[in-house]
Structures are given as C-alpha cells and as structure tokens.
Amino acid sequence: MQAFHFVMALSPIIVVLVGILGFRQSAKRVAPVALVWTLVLGFTFFNRTGATFTESIAVFDGLIWKGLKEGLKIVWMVFGAFVILNLLRDTGAIEDVKATIACISDDRRVQAVVIGMLLPIFLEGAAGAGAPAAIAAPFLAALGFHPVTAIAMALLGDATPCSWGGAGLTTINGGAALVDAGVSTVSLNSAMVGRIHMFGALIIPFLIVFMAFGRKGFKRIVPYLAFTGVTTCGVMFALSNFVGAEVTSMGTGLISMLLSIGYVKLVGVNTPDEFRNHFTARERKYSAFQALSPYVFILALLPAVRYGFPALVKNGFAVMCTFGYIVWVDVVIMLCGFLGALTMKVGLKQYWSVCKKTAKHVTPVLITMSSLLIVSYIMQSPHTGMMNLIASDTAKAVARLYPAAAVAIGAGGSFITGTGLGSNIMFADMHMQAAQTLGMNPITIFAGQNAGASLGNMICPNNTVAACATVDEIGNENQVMKRTLPAFAVLLVLYMALAMLYTCVLFPNFGA
C-alpha cells in the first residue's frame, strides 16, 4: 500500500515525462493534462487534511492564481530575451555578432564553452531566476548553433552555479534551517557544496563539446577543455571556501571567462576546419559594440542593479522584490533590449514590430508555464503532502545510502518546483532530522541536497519550456530533454558518489 501511495504521489511527474519523452508531445499539450490529473488527485486521493470540496476549491484557487502570476513573470523574461534575438535577426546585426565573437575565437567548440557554460555561471550570480539559459540560448543560436543544441548547452552550463544563485541566495536562504538550528553556517554550507560542484565544473566543458559535436568534437581541443575545467574548478573551490556564497557564481564565471579567453589568445587552439564558425564576409553594418550592445548592457546592468540598488537605497533589495525577485530581472532585460535598439539606431516602428512578432510567439507559453507551476504548487502544498511523501519514502528506503539519496531528492525537488532555492527550503529540515537519526553529518548531507537541486534545474520542465520559447522552439521540449538527460545522469551519479564519500569517509566531522 505504501508503494502505491508513492507511485500515486509521483504520477504527475510520470505524466509529464511520459507525455514529453514517451509520446513525444509538446509541453503545451502535456502540461494541461498533468494539471487536470494533479487536481483530481488533490481533490480525492491526496486530500490529507480532510477538507470539504468547498475548502479544497479555496486552497487550489489560490494556488492557480499564484501559478498564473508567476508564469506571467517568467514569460515576461522570455519575451525580453527573445526580443533581443529577433532584433539581431531583423537588423542583420547577427552577422556582425558572429564576426565579433570570431575575433576572440572562430572555433565553435570554444564559443560553446565560453557562451554555453562560463557566461551562464556569471549570469546566475548576477541575477539568477532563469536568466542564464534565457540569455545564453539565444546568444548561441545567434552564433549559428542549432536552437535545440543551444538550449541544451545553456541548461547544462547552468548546472553548477544554481546552488549559490543570485548573490548566494540559494545557499543563504535555502540553508537557513541548518544555520538557525546551530548545526552549520552559511560559510560551511557554501564550502561543502563548492567541494561537490568543483568536480562538475571540471567535466562540464567536455560534456558540452560532446553534446554539441559528439566524440569527433574532441579533436585537438582536449588541452583547452582541460585548462578551462581545471581553472573553473579551482576558482569555484577558492571562492566558495575562502570568500563567500555571495560572489561564488558571478566571480567564478567572470574569472573563468577571462582565463579561458586568455588561454585562447596566448596558447591558441589548433582548430580543424570543420569546427570553424564560417560566416559570410561582408562590410560591417554595425560596430562590435553596437552589434553586441544588448548583451553588453545585460552584463553591466544585471550585477550593477543587483548589488548597487540595495547599497544605495534603504531596504533596496526588499523594494526590488516588491513584485517578486524575477520582476527586476525582467525589467532589466527589457531595458537592455531597448538600449541595444537605440545603440543600433533602430527606429521605434521597427522595434515595435519586433516586439509584436515576439509576443505572438511567446504568448502561448503562458498556458504551459502556468500549468506546470500550478502542478508544482499543488504537489508542494500541505493540503496534498505529495512532495513530502515522495521525499520521506525515498529517505526511508535507502537507510545508510541517505547521502546519495539527498542528491536525488534535491534534484527531484527542483525538477518539480523549478528552483534550487525552493527545493532546499522544502527539504532542509527533513535532511537535518535524517542526519541526526542516522548519526551522519548534516552539512555534507545538505550539500548533497543543494548540489542535486542545482542539477535538477537543467531538466526541469519549467526551465526547458522557457528556454525553448526564447529561440522559437516551442513544442520541441522532448528533443531538448533527450539532450540534457544523459548529461544530468552523469553528473547525478558523480554527485551521489561524492556525497557518500564526503559524508562517510572524508568529512564525517566537517564543521564540528
């Protein structure tokens, strides 16, 4: 009977995965079906509080409205990112973008690593909230990568920094339960998750190249990939262990980008012709700054607003989050697109035309995104207890393998909630209690949870749908997930092994 309850609690996730991957249906068709099924479960099988039908309606009504509002905020960011891509296409600046990036390196594999991994790490620290994939995927598509590949690379590249998120919030707020209980500190939480993610940073450059080009992609580029992996690994370890959670993501991305570009310029990469980014030679329509201006403004304004506004305005961060954290990111991306249009001397009529064309493409995403968010909220709700049932049953089944299970639970939490922060907040208390019962270190177990939650973002349906919308690939979510799942599996197994090793062998008394 217990197993049946577990399967029923898991069934909304099964519906989504089977619908998208098994039946190859678009998320816009699968998401409403999953929502209806989850509502049926919420009214019947998982009515844990014994609420009447009217009381259940009142609970779900609030969750539905919350899903619609949060979905609209995400679609707004998708709209802003897609406007920039369409603006580059419409003006012809996209060719000048390719020519400019080629001045750094015309090797498409180098471009994939820098834009697909290092840029998302920086953007995660500067803003978070889905901005890395929403910005990096269109950028990669603009460079000529297949849109599905571009999305998959951007999601994979953002697999490690989500544990810190914008200004360290995912670790700071997500691990607050351990800090409040006096069993850990923010510094210890950041240090231990950094010791897990450093190995992810080490191998992700190789995974990105394999994802985009297959085995042949490693031809004559292994030294560069090894250098980028080792330096990113080292920088991430140093910042997370000796500086702080607030700057780990942004600092790792920025320093690693500079080191990577420095290697290309000083050492060089012997690029086979098949991996060169060929573009049509023509007279430039825009200067390098003009063509890249929307992205230059994003790189400058996201961290400037995130760190500058709270420093200059009393309760500035609270003001920024008045309508939710993601809204300020939406506004900045929209502003950067508009400033980019002005820099490229695009007329208001043309800019408005691009906006209208983009709106037609992204509006249907609202139904998909809202449906998935509502499913997530219902599963998290105390009214149903579905998410807690999944996590607690998993924990009971694994016993001494709990550190490894914590990684999987963290990934499952972010797969459902769409955020590492949500996953951490949801399960931190449970992990602390389990660690006490099993006589294990709660810091290393929570680090596994935090690292797993970061990984879950790369296969989360919400993030996949949003990223697909930024490059006009709505309906091809199954193709993206087929690309990201193998890389996710590799990293998940690695992190589970590290969680066991750290908890049981290397750091059983860490923080004591």
Regions found by a protein language model. Name each.
Residues M8-V18, Q25-G50, V75-A81, L225, ...:
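Hydrophobic mid-bilayer segments of alpha-helices in multi-pass membrane transport proteins
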Residues D107-P138, A142, L366-P382, A397-M430:
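Hydrophobic alpha-helical transmembrane segments of multi-pass integral membrane proteins
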Residues A58-E95, V114-I121, S287-G308, C321-G385, ...:
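Core transmembrane alpha-helical segments of multi-pass membrane transporters/permeases
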Residues K69-I74, I101-I115, L143-T149, I326-V329, ...:
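Membrane-interfacial loop-to-helix junctions in multi-pass transporters
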Residues L72-I74, L85-E95, F122-A134, T160-G168, ...:
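Short helix-coil transition sites and intra-membrane helix breaks within transmembrane domains
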Residues A27, S163-N277, A451-A512:
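Juxtamembrane and boundary regions of transmembrane helices in multi-pass small-molecule transporters
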Residues A131-A141, A154-L155, G168-D180, I208-M211, ...:
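Re-entrant/interfacial helical elements at transmembrane boundaries that shape
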Residues R109-I121, P147-S163, S184-P205, R400-F415, ...:
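Alpha-helical transmembrane segments of multi-pass membrane proteins
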